[in-house]
Amino acid sequence: MAKQIQAIRGMNDCLPTQSALWQKVEGTIKQVVSAYGYNEIRMPIVESTHLFKRAIGEVTDVVEKEMYTFEDRNGDSLTLRPEGTAGCVRAGIQNGLLYNQEQRLWYIGPMFRYERPQKGRYRQFHQVGVEVFGLNGPDVDAELIMMTARLWRELGINQHVRLELNSIGSLDARATYREALIAFLEQHLEVLDEDCKRRMHTNPLRVLDTKNPAVQEILVDAPKLSEYLDDDSKAHFAGLCELLDAAGIEYQVNERLVRGLDYYNRTVFEWITESLGAQGTVCGGGRYDGLVEQLGGKATPAVGFAMGVERLVLLMETLELADVRRSVDAYVVTVGEGTMMAGMKLAEKLRENVPGLRVMNHFGGGNFKKQFKRADNVGAAIALVLGENEIADNTVVVKDLRGGEQTTMAQDEVTAKLAELI
């Protein structure tokens, strides 16, 4: 026997037993973003490596250690996208969507990062992104946060997530703060681990979100970024907080929240859960007003967020909220000469007249017992039984597979009966 080929580590199959919950989560997300008037955009999975180096930052963990990068046959360096914002901005610039325009976009699809696989963190993961271009006020920042809050309510997880936000100011303000932070960290080198020492000179703000308890302890006395903010960033953040207060959205200001990508400025936020252990961030985003210009477009304000579908699915499973509609509503059982095609015609008629009804025909023969067992296995609520007598009388036996009751009715009446299931 030939050796079995396994899936790549950290890249998982989504099996039929899981896909119904995925469809529920993805469908709910699409309904919510559409309710705000946002339009879908679809970008390639593979982009030029230079795009991510320029957008995310060459000294970030993503670019240095986590990207799947390769050369094609022309010698061009290509990368499987590790996130969606850079590609969305590239598409907007290339297709003339951004200059002097307002765009509200969303996308969904697989992303790739070479990380150590663990619960809630995978090498291929599915991300939903929402991006707004051309608006620079705190009102659109607030709308995005309100959108995520609505999504949590729709999914039933709103009591299990909390919002943290911060302002990291302008590039100039951060540059001044960066020097002050480095000076502080240099006074505590004996406490810093190797990762923090490396970040101290490449991306010192990332030291603020370290998980090392000893480093966290000294950071209590570190300079505060809020004390270095420019006046415009302070006013923008105050306006955002005022709007969230008016909307009744609870939040916590976390002055150590900086996000992991270099393109952010001003607003940054995360939705966090305590139910998934170390992988507690279910959604993160912020403002990136300089990225469009950085990637070759005209200066355009922008803000957005992203969330991982796997993590949302895992959270719903953990909270036992994974109740989804069965995959089959009615199962057609046929026994006797000439009954197969009659059963298929009945199923087609029901699909046409009852939108959303899921009807499965039995194939492969077998007696009633075998077919009813199969109907149970697929989770059908009702069996529709057609034998030679039913075809002669133009009737059908409708059996409730949950309660066991059954009744015989004219085939023309079955449509109304099954419509009650939807």
UniProtKB/Swiss-Prot annotation:
Annotated catalysed reactions: tRNA(His) + L-histidine + ATP = L-histidyl-tRNA(His) + AMP + diphosphate + H(+)
InterPro entries, from UniProt? aa-tRNA-synth_II, aa-tRNA-synth_II/BPL/LPL, Anticodon-bd, Anticodon-bd_dom_sf, His-tRNA-ligase, HisRS-like_core, HisRS/HisZ, HisRS_anticodon
Location in the cell reads: Cytoplasm
Stretches of the chain forming a coiled coil according to its record = none
Main enzyme class: ligase
Q: Name one GO biological process term.
A: histidyl-tRNA aminoacylation
Q: What is its EC number?
A: 6.1.1.21
Gene Ontology molecular-function annotations: ATP binding; histidine-tRNA ligase activity
In its keyword annotation, does this UniProt entry include Nucleotide-binding?
yes
Q: Any idea which UniProt keywords this protein has?
A: Aminoacyl-tRNA synthetase, ATP-binding, Cytoplasm, Ligase, Nucleotide-binding, Protein biosynthesis
**Which GO cellular component terms, listed alphabetically, does the Swiss-Prot or TrEMBL entry include?**
cytoplasm
Q: How does it assemble?
A: Homodimer.
Which PANTHER family does UniProt cross-reference here?
HISTIDINE--TRNA LIGASE, MITOCHONDRIAL-RELATED, HISTIDYL-TRNA SYNTHETASE
Q: Which family does the record assign?
A: Belongs to the class-II aminoacyl-tRNA synthetase family.
- Output this protein's name: Histidine--tRNA ligase
Q: Which organism is it from?
A: Photobacterium profundum (strain SS9)
